[in-house]
């Protein structure tokens, strides 16, 4: 597990970043890689997004960001933040290239042992390239005291890894459910994961 020197951790600039993965879609429910395909939320996904509203209502956010893809934007709107959200291209999901729409078992039929984290998708982004986008999101978020960002599964996992100075591919160690909340903050001055994959509002 590779770590960067403490002085260069992306989260060192301060602030708190709350990440919300979009609600369920038909593709996410079936395990299909959903990158640039602009798929809508399922009925369950919309219900889960609405449950986020009450959970997040009591917290003040200086800034709200969202991916341009509708599954994240609609989650943001149903959670009550659509009127103030900034659309940020870097919050879009990993570009899976030719592996878009396929499940991991389908991909492994031709490439045994494949993971998006190590080998990457055919004709899509590498983990390092997604990591560069994650760093830009972190740099934007840490300009404010507390930022709320609506994004996607793999992208948010990369942001979590980069916040604490790990390589983007170490996001493989951070599982993330749909409509889950994550909080990235600090232990004194050190960037830390305060909360991860919180779905208690869906119970």
Predicted regions, residues:
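Loop-to-helix element that buttresses phosphate recognition and phosphoryl-transfer chemistry
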Residues: 15-75, 122-135
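Acidic, low-complexity terminal tails and accessory targeting/binding regions
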Residues: 1-15, 94-105, 143, 161-203
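Phosphate-coordination/substrate-recognition cap region in phosphate-metabolizing enzymes
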Residues: 2-11, 50-115
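GST superfamily/GST-like fold recognition
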Residues: 153-157, 187
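Active-site signature of alpha/beta-hydrolase-fold catalytic machinery across serine-
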Residues: 78, 158, 162
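Glycine-rich phosphate-binding loop signature in dinucleotide/nucleotide-binding domains
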Residues: 57-60, 141-145
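Short glycine/proline- and acidic residue-enriched helix-loop micro-motifs
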Residues: 109-129
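Generic beta-sheet signal
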Residues: 17, 144-154
